[in-house]
Amino acid sequence: MADHSKNEAAAYALKLLSLRSHSRFELAGKMLRKGYRKELVEEVLDYLVQKQLIDDEAFAKELIGSRSRRKPVGKRKMQFDLIRKGVPENIADALLKEYDGAELCYRAGVRKAAALKGRDESERKKKLEVFLRNRGFDWPVIKETITRLFQTGPECEND
């Protein structure tokens, strides 16, 4: 195992942070895989937290916002993704209290319904249900979305 200096380890962590935000857990994993000693990694990460360059709560907010805009997912899946990325469960729970899964489900449903345009209604409903379930939305929210889309005539049909 290579013997790395604190400055070298900090430079590597800062390089990773310059590319995108990371949780403390993600950075630790990448640094350990790179060959840095655990004690050195912890020391560097403590320093970066102290300097507010690593903030798991800010990272989680950024991830939630990004996913909500780009690829909406259900509350359960979002919580799973946050925890998988190393965000402490208490932070994930607190941030997801206000998570509007119904509106995100509807937005994802509108996009998918547009992609399914031209198919018969029952096939579109089934494919939409599977798509939304795979995105982690709960059945009551999926049912409401499908009803809303097909009751008013899918918005995608008017495009």
Swiss-Prot record:
Report if keyword Cytoplasm is assigned.
Answer: yes
One GO CC term on file: cytoplasm
Task: Give the UniProt subcellular location, in the record's own words.
Answer: Cytoplasm
Q: What is its main location?
A: cytoplasm
**InterPro entries from the entry?**
RecX_HTH_1st, RecX_HTH_2nd, Regulatory_RecX, WH-like_DNA-bd_sf
Gene Ontology biological-process annotations: regulation of DNA repair
Question: Is Plastid set as a keyword in this record?
Answer: no
What superkingdom does the record give?
A: Bacteria
Q: Any coiled-coil ranges, and where?
A: none
Name the UniProt key words of this record, in alphabetical order. Answer: Cytoplasm
Query: Which HAMAP family does its entry note?
Result: RecX
Its biological purpose: Modulates RecA activity.
Please report which protein family the annotation says this sequence is part of: Belongs to the RecX family.
Identify this protein by name. Answer: Regulatory protein RecX
Q: What is the lineage of its organism?
A: Bacteria, Pseudomonadati, Chlorobiota, Chlorobiia, Chlorobiales
Gene name of this polypeptide: recX
